[in-house]
Amino acid sequence: MDREKQQLSIEAARLYYQSDYSQQQIAEQLNISRPTVSRLLQYAKEKGYVQIRVMDPFEDLDALGSILEEKYGLLEAHVVFSPTPDYAGITHDLSRYGAEYMHETVKDGDIVGVSWGTTMYQIAQNMQPKQVKGVEVVQLKGGISHSRVNTYSAETIQLFAEAFQTMPRYLPLPVVFDNADVKRMVEKDRHIERIIEMGKQANIALFTVGTVRDEALLFRLGYFNEEEKALLKKQAVGDICSRFFDAKGNICSSAINDRTIGVELQDLRLKERSILVAGGSRKVSSIHGALTGKYANVLIIDQHTARALVNDL
């Protein structure tokens, strides 16, 4: 009798869990009553013939975050669930989370430094108003170019300023000058010097990383000639605030860096919260270099990219 019950319970379990039969359909198929089907399914679970495993993606996310915090010495690592490894989808999910994080984090009296780029603009578009007092929002790098490619630099900082009930502090300059001497002369302007100093004093910095791929935004803005692009592609893995670094996080071209205006990478290490929002397979090396250089102490990343970092790229 026990053997017959075992076989019947297994058959009922197969129909229920593998073939999606209802208990009534199983009863008709096996010529038994519906209550008997229910008892057989319970028996199958008790005997271990059926093992139900609930996959909680968020449990894995917490573990990934802890590993990243330890590996890179981060204050916080937030791993955001994104259904697919598609870059556009990842950016959408990270941007929503980034906006929520900023809404929760910014408090009265904070100075918030903001970069620009596709990810930053999407975060800005997701920002919700927050009643805070005395907050300053400052642009961390220049955003003017000769190209028709829109950086949305002005729109980005405007949206952040509106969210925190303040006026935006623009840095109305090219991010990369043709000549380092001209850049140094411009930096001496009283207004420009004050904006750059405010970016340096910001206790919160929000930024992403760029790549050195052909389609990288900075490569499409007309700042670099072909020789400079080739150099950056060969030596760099990415950029933060238009300052290029190698796999170890070191500045890879002092000549180009000297022409770049805005926050210095070393200043990001001194922030109360230096927040990097980035994800996607194309940015794995860039993120690794940025974290190795200790330019961020808070990371917002998707689980696909997080696993690549945990598995050493």
UniProtKB/Swiss-Prot annotation:
Key word Repressor present: yes
Disulfide pattern: none
InterPro entries: NagB/RpiA_transferase-like (IPR037171), RNA_pol_sigma_r3/r4-like (IPR013324), SorC_transcr_regulators (IPR051054), Sugar-bd_dom_put (IPR007324)
One Gene Ontology biological process: regulation of DNA-templated transcription initiation
Pfam families: HTH_23 (PF13384), Sugar-bind (PF04198)
DNA-binding annotation, residue ranges on this chain: 23-42
Keywords: DNA-binding, Repressor, Transcription, Transcription regulation
Molecular function in Gene Ontology: carbohydrate binding; cis-regulatory region sequence-specific DNA binding; identical protein binding
Quaternary context: Homooctamer.
Name of this protein: Deoxyribonucleoside regulator
Organism lineage string: Bacteria, Bacillati, Bacillota, Bacilli, Bacillales
Gene: deoR
